């Protein structure tokens, strides 16, 4: 794509700029729907991340393209509400060549999914330290009336110093937003959905808490609580039953996973309660004050 004249500086005509101030330096990630660039805000002289919508409409797919545009704009609006140490900050939204771009905080990091793929499962206390930060970010989101709806290892970024931040609010929902997901479609990643969402219910803060539990289960066990299946419909059926396989390597995290993954939303802790419990596990203490609901029968907890 050739940049418009207004976004090309005479001294280097090959440099791409978005919105007249954001220089694209390197594409660092790409998927079917979009790409993420490392860039420079030349006005403030800081490194930023820019998210680009890549979808091109084919005949008959104009609705899909418009839905994608609206989703990325919604991500920008929701991100602007959330200024928190464990949520990737949103700085700006720019429409360029009729495509929305999100300008976000750049965090040199890898996703939790990438960390697990390289290093294998975590120990209970290490996973709890990550989960505590994610729960802290979710607490802020829920207080702002935002449900993330797609908490999973791929949407948790881990910096070199161990800082964890939630990213990708593209399918999240604010209480005052219009519904963008078409009737009959489920937003989120099947392996990490709460059972009530897999059955067609509306996502709630409690379903985010379940997804947090599923993420931590995957972090210590090596795969999600309902396993993996290339057949998304078969996997959704498993998730809808709410029957979780008891973990074998979760150690001191086991009792907390049991309540985070409780089949009934009312039996799960809030994100704030989960944060406090995860802080305790990370510090080697026993969490207290959790709901009585459990996803599986509990024996004696294994050591951390």
Describe the role of every protein-language-model region.
Residues 1-12, 20, 56-62, 219, ...:
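Proline- and threonine-rich low-complexity intrinsically disordered cytosolic regions
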Residues 24-32, 36:
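Protein kinase glycine-rich loop
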Residues 54-81:
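AlphaC helix of the eukaryotic protein kinase fold
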Residues 93:
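Activation-segment/catalytic-loop signature of the eukaryotic protein kinase fold
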Residues 97-111, 115:
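Conserved short submotifs of the Hanks-type protein kinase catalytic core
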Residues 130-131:
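Activation segment signature within eukaryotic-like protein kinase domains
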Residues 208:
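Conserved catalytic-loop aspartate of Hanks-type protein kinases
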């Amino acid at each position: 794509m050739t940049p418009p004249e207004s976004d090309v500086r005479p001294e280097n005509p090959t440099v791409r700029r978005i919105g007249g101030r954001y220089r694209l330096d390197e594409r660092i990630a790409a998927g079917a729907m979009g790409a993420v660039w490392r860039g420079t805000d030349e006005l403030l002289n800081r490194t930023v991340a820019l998210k680009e919508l890549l979808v091109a409409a084919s005949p008959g797919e104009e609705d899909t393209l418009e839905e994608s545009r609206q989703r990325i704009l919604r991500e920008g609006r929701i991100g602007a509400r959330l200024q928190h140490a464990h949520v990737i900050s949103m700085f700006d939204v720019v429409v360029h060549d009729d495509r929305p771009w999100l300008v976000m905080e750049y965090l040199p990091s890898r996703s939790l999914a990438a960390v697990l793929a390289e290093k294998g499962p975590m120990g209970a206390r290490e996973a709890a330290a990550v989960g505590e930060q994610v729960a802290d970010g979710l607490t802020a989101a829920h207080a702002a009336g935002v449900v993330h709806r797609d908490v999973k290892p791929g949407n948790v970024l881990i910096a070199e110093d161990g800082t964890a931040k939630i990213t990708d609010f593209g399918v999240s929902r604010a209480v005052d937003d219009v519904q963008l997901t078409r009737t009959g479609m489920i937003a989120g990643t099947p392996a990490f959905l709460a059972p009530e969402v897999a059955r067609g219910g509306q996502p709630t803060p409690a379903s985010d808490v379940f997804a947090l539990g599923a993420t931590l289960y995957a972090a210590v066990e090596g795969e999600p609580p309902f396993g993996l299946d290339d057949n998304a419909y078969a996997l959704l059926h498993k998730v809808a039953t709410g029957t979780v396989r008891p973990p074998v390597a979760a150690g001191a995290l086991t009792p907390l996973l049991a309540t985070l993954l409780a089949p009934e939303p009312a039996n799960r802790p809030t994100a704030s309660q989960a944060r406090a419990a995860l802080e305790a596990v990370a510090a080697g203490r026993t969490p207290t004050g959790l709901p009585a609901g459990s996803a599986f029968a509990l024996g004696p907890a294994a050591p951390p």
